[in-house]
Curated annotation (Swiss-Prot):
GO molecular function: exodeoxyribonuclease VII activity
Keywords, alphabetical: Cytoplasm, Exonuclease, Hydrolase, Nuclease
Signal peptide: none
Quaternary structure note: Heterooligomer composed of large and small subunits.
A GO BP entry: DNA catabolic process
EC number: 3.1.11.6
Gene Ontology CC entries for this record: cytosol; exodeoxyribonuclease VII complex
Protein task: Bidirectionally degrades single-stranded DNA into large acid-insoluble oligonucleotides, which are then degraded further into small acid-soluble oligonucleotides.
Designated name of the protein: Exodeoxyribonuclease 7 small subunit
Subcellular location as annotated: Cytoplasm
Lineage: Bacteria, Pseudomonadati, Pseudomonadota, Gammaproteobacteria, Legionellales
């Protein structure tokens, strides 16, 4: 189930938890039930992280008005040359 939009979502903490779950699953020491519970939690975390990345991508896009039509243009990071 995708996460509900909330101000309390922490992408980095979710990614760290997902990494820990993967490590547990890779060790192979869990029972089948524990593995399924961890897998289910991991799927939820992946979906939440994907949604957070999608939301961030939308925020980065810049709305430009061209010829009276609104157009979404991807944000391009300026590279700094020293």
């Amino acid at each position: 189930m995708p996460r509900k939009k909330t101000e309390n979502f922490n992408f980095e903490a979710s990614l760290n938890e997902l990494t820990a779950l993967v490590e547990k699953l890779e060790q192979g020491d869990l029972t089948l039930e524990e593995s399924l519970q961890n897998f289910e939690r991991g799927v939820g975390l992946v979906r939440s992280c994907q949604q957070a990345l999608s939301d961030a991508e939308q925020k980065v896009k810049v709305l430009i008005n061209q010829d009276g039509a609104e157009t979404l243009v991807p944000f391009e990071l300026e590279t700094k040359t020293d």
